[in-house]
Structure formats: C-alpha cells, structure tokens
C-alpha cells in the first residue's frame, strides 16, 4: 500500500477541498462518512450502469461494491455513483430504440459531469449493455484522468432440447413462426429459456465486441472482457480494477497515454478477426474523436483487407462468447495475432505494462479447440466488416458480411420510412427474393437516435431469405444481425443524402468485391427528385430533439460535440 504522504500527493483534483475556505464542502463530505484521515486520500469514483430492467446490468450494483473494496485496499477513498442504461434487446422494435444510441452520449456526459463536479482523481466505470462501454470510454477520453473500464461479463447460453440458444434465437424464432416453421408454443419455449441469468448478450454481439475492443485498446484489465458474468474470475477482476486504477494514479498514467493510433488499429484488427458488430465502427470513431486520434471510416477497410475472420462465433457461427473464454479468451486470440505480426506489442496499457508484457501471463489457445480457426484456414480470408461507397452512400456505409456467400446483389428497392412499415411488409409476405428492403429517415438525426433493425433483419433470416433479400438503412443493426445487410448509410436521409430520394423499383447494387453501393439513376432524375421531394422537419422535443440538432453523421461516429472549424476558431 502507498503511504499517506504519497497518497496525499495523488490528490491531483480533490486537493481543492483542502483550504480553510472549503470547510463547508468538507462538512458535506463528512456526512458521507469521510473522517480527517480520509481527506488525505485520493477520491476514486466507482460508476455503474446498474438497472433492474435488463439482465445485462442487473448485477452491476453489487459489482460496484466489489470495485470499492479494491479501491479501499489500495488506500484511496471510493465513492459510488450511478448512471443510466437503455437495453437494446428490450427497446428493440419499439419507439424506445431511439434512445439507445442517444444513451451512449448521455452516459458519457453524465460520467463527466459527476466526476468533474465532484473533483474525482480517478474512476472505475462498470458497464454491461451495448452503449455502456463506449459511453464510459468517451468520458474517460474527454476527462483524461486515470480510469479503467470493467465489463459486467457475458451471459451464459440458454439451453433447449440439449442445444445452446440465446436472445437472437428468439428474434429469429418469430420469423420462423411467421413463415409457418414454428408454433407459438415453440417460440414461447425459446423465450423462456434463452436468457438464464445476468450478463451481456452472449454472441459476438455489440456488448462483447465493445468489451473486447476496450480490453484491446488497453483500458480494461487483460483477460477481463472474456470472463462470464457469473464466474469467480469476473468478481476478481472487478475488485482488481479498483486496485489497478489507484496504481494508474501512482504511475501518472492517463487515457491519453493509452489511446494511441496504434491502439485503435489493434482494436479494429481484433474486431475483424472475431467478427464483431457493425456498431464497433460507430463507437471506435466516437472514442477516437474524444481522444483526439485521427481515425476515419475508410481506415476500417485497410484492416478489413488484411485481417482474416477467424472466430466461429454467433451470430454467423456456432459458438457463444463463453465458449471463447473456455479456450483461452481474448488474450489467447491476441497472443495468436501478435505472434503472427498483426498487433502492436509495444504500446502501453492500463497495467503500466505493454501489450506483449501483459500477454506473457496467459496461455495460448487450447490445442484442438474449434472456436478460433487457424490463419491457414480462416472462416473468411478477409474481415467481415466492409465500408461501402457509391452514389447511394457518398460518405460511406457499413456492411457485415460474415457468413454471407453472396458477393454481389442487384435488385429492386422496396422503400419504407420506418421499421414498422417494413416489418408489416415482411409479415404480409410482400417481400420477395431479390428485393432490396430500404428503411430510411432512421439515421442519427432522422430517427432520431439511429435505431437498430434486429427485429426486421431476424424476421427476414427466420423466413429463409437471409441471403436472398438485402436490407439497407441509414439506421443501425444489432450486433446480433447477420444476412445481407448494409447500415450507417451517409449522408442520412434527414440530411438530404441520396437515400432520401431512392424510390421503390429503383435498381440497387451491393458489391462486396468493389465495395460499391449504387442505385441506377441519371443525374437529371436525381436533381428532379431533390427539387420536388420535401424532407421532414427535425424532431424538436426533449432529449431526442436536442440530439437531432447536434449529432454528427454516422460517418463521423454520431458524436454530439463535433464542431466545424468556423464555430471554434480551430482548424
């Protein structure tokens, strides 16, 4: 343990409470339990996104208490805070989904406000659901004080008739039911067995993707992203996070030391190798923006072209994230990639050690395991996340093609201005093989909030049309989505992007090899449509109204603090 004199020296921010004129401030703090000796300790915030309404977060209040134990053992004064969460799985397919991406920035802002307002010297952030992770790390980058992210862990798979199932099994079950392949009773059995306890959704979906990416970035303890929610290892690494953040204070180690360009390159590399969520593009861009690291959407294509897809994980594969934990977890994958020249081993992490030094403590992948395929025989020779461009997406779009055999799809558009309209068309069998289903005016500004389309995409897959019908949107897709899907189309319809002027019957081309997203239209016809079609007004009420008016394009990470140079005086 650090001695008191050294501890007092670590109070880079909380020392503002020391002077005589701050006696009233200390009076308030004494009511929270602080004694004379505690005013010589650094204040460490412990923030959790605990909530009772979702399995991803239901256990996080107790995890916050564990982190406090670690902080206390390291000699600092822990203070537990809470912030919000929005469950994507519960909000999915409802108007509540508009608040999902919005919550990422609310989380970031609320952490910054709480830690800044209370002059914390460092903090641990604990998250479980999709937007918790990037929201926490955006706050870390903006504040640039010692901080560690601790993931609440992945959920165990459900089991039905001897087979592993998960939440996406239920979403797809609805499609099977609509197609006549399942009874209501069979779907109910899926519903009742898919989620057996606490933890983030179990495949290589957004929560596990972002937890992995943050570990690779270096802001989570090595190995922690793979530990299941109910494991002893998870409880241990939550407590250790409390001790580790005090060590960061001692070392003077800050997020800006860790969040380098090389760190983001490694995060993209591992995301490609594991077949991570399309949402990773959005969130890594946003984190890089907060960290003042130059990262663009097209950078993802650089790594897509050279990093093979190795993981046989859901949604396109057989295994869940807990299976990866059993064969060595994220560190074993990183060791494999490092040995083969894919990662930067010499960059610093939250432990104060380099990536290579951290990985020495971990075993290689279990011999004979089937979760991670060898580089000589990958699941796919390049990465599964592709950035597309063309006259339908001048600023880019994101396609996830893991498990998709179709390299090129050309078909007529069927255009909808909401997911609800598109779902109704699918349920009524109005969508036929070859169609390109388009859902627009659901981007960051248009949604507002860029809702995900898992309900729609899962129904299409469940009906057996996953590789026969393409799905395009200026909104997002869940990490649980697979099939022929393209999202994040930019500029979005609400900004007057070409997708706003696409009409039912227009022929759309999606090409993996040329990375093209195109629709057949003459310049004259496009100009005519632009002159005659009126765009709807921006949403104007409450938090969604605020969000719609300030959020950037998805191609810039849908950030809420992107200012043009003329607005800041900076270039």
Swiss-Prot record:
Pfam families, from UniProt? ILV_EDD_C, ILVD_EDD_N
Ligand binding (Mg(2+)): 88, 130-131, 452
Which residues are recorded as modified (N6-carboxylysine)?
131
For this UniProt record, give its keywords in alphabetical order, as a comma-separated list: 2Fe-2S, Amino-acid biosynthesis, Branched-chain amino acid biosynthesis, Iron, Iron-sulfur, Lyase, Magnesium, Metal-binding
What InterPro entries does this protein's entry cite?
DHAD_IlvD/Edd, Dihydro-acid_dehy_C, DihydroxyA_deHydtase, DiOHA_6PGluconate_deHydtase_CS, ILV_EDD_C, ILV_EDD_N, IlvD/EDD_N
Give the metabolic or biological pathway. Answer: Amino-acid biosynthesis; L-isoleucine biosynthesis; L-isoleucine from 2-oxobutanoate: step 3/4; Amino-acid biosynthesis; L-valine biosynthesis; L-valine from pyruvate: step 3/4
Kindly state a single biological-process term from the GO annotations of this entry.
L-valine biosynthetic process
Cofactor comment in the record? Binds 1 [2Fe-2S] cluster per subunit. This cluster acts as a Lewis acid cofactor.
Gene Ontology MF annotations = 2 iron, 2 sulfur cluster binding; dihydroxy-acid dehydratase activity; magnesium ion binding
E.C. number:
4.2.1.9
Q: Which cofactor does it need?
A: [2Fe-2S] cluster; Mg(2+)
Q: Does the keyword Transmembrane helix apply?
A: no
The residues the record assigns to binding [2Fe-2S] cluster are 56, 129, 201
Identify the catalytic residues. 478
Q: So what does this thing catalyse?
A: (2R)-2,3-dihydroxy-3-methylbutanoate = 3-methyl-2-oxobutanoate + H2O; (2R,3R)-2,3-dihydroxy-3-methylpentanoate = (S)-3-methyl-2-oxopentanoate + H2O
Task: Note the superkingdom of the native organism.
Answer: Bacteria
HAMAP family, sorted: IlvD (MF_00012)
- Protein purpose: Functions in the biosynthesis of branched-chain amino acids. Catalyzes the dehydration of (2R,3R)-2,3-dihydroxy-3-methylpentanoate (2,3-dihydroxy-3-methylvalerate) into 2-oxo-3-methylpentanoate (2-oxo-3-methylvalerate) and of (2R)-2,3-dihydroxy-3-methylbutanoate (2,3-dihydroxyisovalerate) into 2-oxo-3-methylbutanoate (2-oxoisovalerate), the penultimate precursor to L-isoleucine and L-valine, respectively.
Q: Which NCBIfam families match?
A: ilvD, PRK00911.1
What family is reported? Belongs to the IlvD/Edd family.
Q: How does it assemble?
A: Homodimer.
Q: What is this protein called?
A: Dihydroxy-acid dehydratase
């Amino acid at each position: 343990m650090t001695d008191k004199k050294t501890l007092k020296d670590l109070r880079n921010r909380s020392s503002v409470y020391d002077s005589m004129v701050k006696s009233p401030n200390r009076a308030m703090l004494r009511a929270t339990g602080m004694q004379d000796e505690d005013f010589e300790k650094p204040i460490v915030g412990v923030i959790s996104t605990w909530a009772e309404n979702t399995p991803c977060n239901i256990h996080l209040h107790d995890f916050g208490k564990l982190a406090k134990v670690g902080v206390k053992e390291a000699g600092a004064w822990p203070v537990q805070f809470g912030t919000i969460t929005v469950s994507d799985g519960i909000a999915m397919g409802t108007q509540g989904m508009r608040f999902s991406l919005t919550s990422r920035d609310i989380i970031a802002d609320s952490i910054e406000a709480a830690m800044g307002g209370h002059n914390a010297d460092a903090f641990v952030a604990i998250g479980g659901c999709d937007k918790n992770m990037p929201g926490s790390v955006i706050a870390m980058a903006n504040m640039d004080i010692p901080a560690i992210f601790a993931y609440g862990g992945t959920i165990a798979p459900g089991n039905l008739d001897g087979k592993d199932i998960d939440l996406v099994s239920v979403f797809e079950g609805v499609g099977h039911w609509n197609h006549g392949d399942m009874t209501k009773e069979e779907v109910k059995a899926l519903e009742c067995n898919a989620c057996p306890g606490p933890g983030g959704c179990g495949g290589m979906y957004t929560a596990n993707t972002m937890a992995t990416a943050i570990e690779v970035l270096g802001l989570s303890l090595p190995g922690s992203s793979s530990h299941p929610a109910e494991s002893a290892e998870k409880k241990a690494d939550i407590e250790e996070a409390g001790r580790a953040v005090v060590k960061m204070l001692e070392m003077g180690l800050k997020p800006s030391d860790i969040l380098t360009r090389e760190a983001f390159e490694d995060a993209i590399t591992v995301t490609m190798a594991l077949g991570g969520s399309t949402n990773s593009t959005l969130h890594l861009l946003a984190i890089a923006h907060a960290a003042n690291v130059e990262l663009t959407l097209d950078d993802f294509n650089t790594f897509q072209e050279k990093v093979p897809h190795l993981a046989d994980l859901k949604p396109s594969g057989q295994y869940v994230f807990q299976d990866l934990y059993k064969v060595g977890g994220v560190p074993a994958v990183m060791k494999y990639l490092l040995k083969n020249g894919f990662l930067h081993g010499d960059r610093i992490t939250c432990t104060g050690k380099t990536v290579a030094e951290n990985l020495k403590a971990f075993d290689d992948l279990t011999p004979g395991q089937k979760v991670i395929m060898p580089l000589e025989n990958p699941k796919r020779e390049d990465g599964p996340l592709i950035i597309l461009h063309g006259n339908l997406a001048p600023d880019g779009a994101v396609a996830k093609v893991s498990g998709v055999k179709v390299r090129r799809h050309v078909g007529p558009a069927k255009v909808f201005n909401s997911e609800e309209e598109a779902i109704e068309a699918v349920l009524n069998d109005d969508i036929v093989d070859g169609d390109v289903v388009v859902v627009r005016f659901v981007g960051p500004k248009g949604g507002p909030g860029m809702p995900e389309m898992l309900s729609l995409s899962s129904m299409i897959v469940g009906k057996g049309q996953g590789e026969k019908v393409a799905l395009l949107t200026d909104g997002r897709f869940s990490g649980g989505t697979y099939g022929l899907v393209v999202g994040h189309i930019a500029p979005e319809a609400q900004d007057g992007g070409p997708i706003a002027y696409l009409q039912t019957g227009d022929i759309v081309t999606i090409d993996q090899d040329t990375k093209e997203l195109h629709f057949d239209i003459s310049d004259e016809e496009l100009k005519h449509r632009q002159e005659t079609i009126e765009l709807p007004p921006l949403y104007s009420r409450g938090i969604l109204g605020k969000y719609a008016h300030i959020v950037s394009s998805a191609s810039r990470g849908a950030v809420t603090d992107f200012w043009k140079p003329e607005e800041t005086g900076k270039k």
